[in-house]
């Protein structure tokens, strides 16, 4: 199992979820030691990671770049779905993007 992503309310209520059954999110992530990454490197493949409204615009920019740089077609396709999910959450008060690691 991969790193699932969900939009959730501040109470933790699930609004929408994207499953990563083929472990594709990790193919878009930089190394944890990559200091040029502001958000993506902190997605924990084995734990939970939450991005708030101040972080989401930066996350979206980084994700677009990761998708553009990828050569893995399945990862690109999944990244596009993840991007749409993040954009849906962006700008919505008390709404978060949560990643649930394996």
Which residue ranges define each predicted feature?
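Acidic (Asp/Glu-rich) sequence patches and key acidic residues
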Residues: 1-102
């Amino acid at each position: 199992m991969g790193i699932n992503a969900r939009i959730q309310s501040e109470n933790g209520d699930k609004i929408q979820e994207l499953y990563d059954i083929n472990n594709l999110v990790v193919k878009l992530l930089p190394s944890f030691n990559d200091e040029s990454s502001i958000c993506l490197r902190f997605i924990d493949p084995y734990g939970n990671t939450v991005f708030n409204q101040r972080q989401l615009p930066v996350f979206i920019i980084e994700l677009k770049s990761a998708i553009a740089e990828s050569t893995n077609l399945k990862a690109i396709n999944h990244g596009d779905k993840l991007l749409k999910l993040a954009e849906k959450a962006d700008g919505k008060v008390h709404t978060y993007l949560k990643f649930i690691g394996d």
